[in-house]
Amino acid sequence: MLGTRASKLTMVDKVPPSFSSMERMRHISLFILLGAGGSLLLLTGCTTGRVASGAPYHVTAYRPHDPSAVRVKVSLSKENIYVMEGDRSLMAVACSVGIPDKPTPKGNFKIYAKEEQKRSGSYGFSVQGNRIVPSTGGGPGRYVGYPMGYWCEFAPAYGFHQGFVHPYPRTHGCIRLHGEAAPKFYALVKIGTPVNIANSQPEDETLGPKVQRVDDSKTPDPPASLMVTSGAFQKPSGPLLE
């Protein structure tokens, strides 16, 4: 069974039914530092070092000349996302992908659903006065779904979304983007944007070495009291696209 801080899961990564209440809360309580005050900054395209939690990390995303020409490529082996317009790189960032037992699906897909402030209908929180406890719906209290910010669905129950990025596969099949990158990815793609997911991509050789890594594995858990508010969906400051 997963335990402790090193085994955190986030966003739409499914909560196994065997999780204890405390483990489920740990699973649920990981989003806010990436979406609210204290979100990290992402820098791509100029350095290859690893950035630890709390270090500056800033993503530059470029506005496409032709939005209909935007393509998304995911390299599972490198855990990189390349947003391309022809040969032009619009954004190249690190991500977290599925663990071996729950892999991210490979193949050609299209973005077919987007929701900036999506919440889960199957797990989240029960708000009971001043008490907030993990919940899968039903029971006492007011149910508030787990925040799945900047959700871009490419296959049933699989999507790109905001969450902690680890330097190793960590999700239950979805693709997590850092809190500074997820809103920019959301702005770049539209319904119908093609997505290719493969073990490797040609861009691994050209763009991959320039993608700065990030390690959120030791980022502290945010409070559940913020998870149930709109503060879970705050945008980064400044323009999303250059």
Regions found by a protein language model. Give the residues of each.
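Bacterial N-terminal signal peptides that target proteins for export
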Residues: 20-33
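Low-complexity, intrinsically disordered Ser/Thr/Pro- and acidic-rich segments
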Residues: 2-4
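Bacterial N-terminal signal peptides
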Residues: 32-42
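Exported/periplasmic cell-wall-interacting domains
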Residues: 46, 51, 119, 125-242
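Cell wall/extracellular polymer interaction/catalysis modules
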Residues: 46-120, 124, 137-141, 149
